[in-house]
Amino acid sequence: MTSNRHTNSNWLKDYKSKLFLTDTQKEVLIGTLLGDGSIKISVSGKAARLQICQSFDYKEYVFWKKSIFKEWVLSGPKYYKVNNSLIFRTVSHPEIYKFYSKFYKNKVKIIPKDINDILKSNLSLAVWFMDDGNGYQHMDSYRLSTYAFGYEGNLLLQKCLLVNFGLKTNLVRDSRGFQIYVPVRSGDADKFKKLVMNHIIPKMRYKFRNTSPVETDLTK
């Protein structure tokens, strides 16, 4: 239950004024925005909140993310039976709005043109994979589901992965759009795994297995 003080506007205003995003929180936020996370803008248009939505099957991952943003989250996660999901939201804040202004255009998530300056850490890469990646037997690759970002967005991501992480990837088109694949045979999949493995929580390590792709995104 939310404490009464959390609904007190003066207390909340003072509480928010003391918040700032740590480097770790920024890195997790970046990976989350490339994956399943979304940002909701406030009524004022000057602040925004991060929303995390995942299947209840991945509750350990949800609670891990909440632990990262613990001072930003005043309640939840809340269970929604209709789609068997867990959702939590941060407080609205100008710091998160900065990421909204980068990753959204006309309320639609995009890839910023300066993504090379944003996606630079192995932690961000790992969170992106935990959100929207998996091993894909048919393509003998690790797959990053990037349908939402269109051709141009995928090209920006592909270049970023090469420049910042030394990863050569394939851009593959199917009936739904474009996705990024990190091939096994070239050795890039092994390189990718070494970059992210220390940041993958135990519950999500199954994603390295070669399986048919399973969509877990409940927010798009």
Regions found by a protein language model. Give the residues of each.
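Internal intein/HINT superfamily modules and their associated LAGLIDADG
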Residues: 1-220
